[in-house]
Amino acid sequence: MKVPAIIFSRMGSSRLPGKALRHIAGEPLIKRVINRVSKVKNLSTIVVATSNSKADDRLVRYIQSLNIDVFRGAAHDVLNRAVSCASYLGVEKFVRINGDSPFIDPELLEKGIELGGDPNLDLISNVFPRTYPVGTSVEIIK
């Protein structure tokens, strides 16, 4: 089963504005996340879902320079952005990734995607209860 990965990222963080493009070990945070996610074998595509706010224009240009698709939606309604992006992609199921998770584990994502092949499951997650470190969340949503 192949599913898309939707990476949620925007520049308007209240705790650390602009963090998506802040450099971590010499490259922007969002690039580190994209690089980790791109190692996952059973993805159909990678899309970065950001807001339609002008504040995210710079982020959009950067992501497009990496040849990664971008979806723009509601700034403060992540659920709406997720549903709209899935609809835009024409999918019922997707991998949800936080854009500030540079330590996401590709192998863990692959295991989650394999479990997500069960049509009776609407959510696969390793955060209920949290047993993995923050920043390594896996969520496959239907």
Enumerate the predicted regions with their spans.
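Conserved core of the sugar-phosphate nucleotidyltransferase
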Residues: 104-142
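Short, high-confidence coil segments that cap the C-terminus of an alpha-helix
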Residues: 43, 91, 118-122
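N-terminal glycine-rich phosphate-binding loop and ensuing alpha1 helix
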Residues: 2-50
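Short glycine-enriched loop/turn motifs at secondary-structure junctions
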Residues: 15, 64, 130-134
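Short beta-strand segments
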Residues: 8, 97-98, 127
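Short phosphate-binding loop-to-helix
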Residues: 52-117
